[in-house]
């Protein structure tokens, strides 16, 4: 998957998709910086899974 900009509900949807049953902790400051302001990939999202 190519890195992409994910903001707002798109970011939350992507976290649900990547983390599934594990769930995730939503740290807007960190993840918005990494995935909305700059493009990020799935590995970055996985860091936010529980």
UniProtKB/Swiss-Prot annotation:
UniProt GO molecular function: hormone activity
UniProt keyword annotation of Secreted present: yes
SMART domains for the chain: IlGF (SM00078)
Main location: secreted
Biological process, per Gene Ontology: glucose metabolic process
Subunit structure: Heterodimer of a B chain and an A chain linked by two disulfide bonds.
General function of this protein: Insulin decreases blood glucose concentration. It increases cell permeability to monosaccharides, amino acids and fatty acids. It accelerates glycolysis, the pentose phosphate cycle, and glycogen synthesis in liver.
Protein name, UniProt field: Insulin
Lineage: Eukaryota, Metazoa, Chordata, Craniata, Vertebrata
Gene behind this protein: ins
């Amino acid at each position: 998957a190519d890195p992409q900009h994910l903001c707002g509900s798109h970011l939350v949807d992507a976290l649900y998709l990547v983390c599934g049953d594990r769930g995730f902790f939503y740290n807007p400051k960190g993840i918005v910086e990494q995935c909305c302001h700059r493009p990020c990939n799935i590995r970055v999202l996985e860091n936010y899974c529980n």
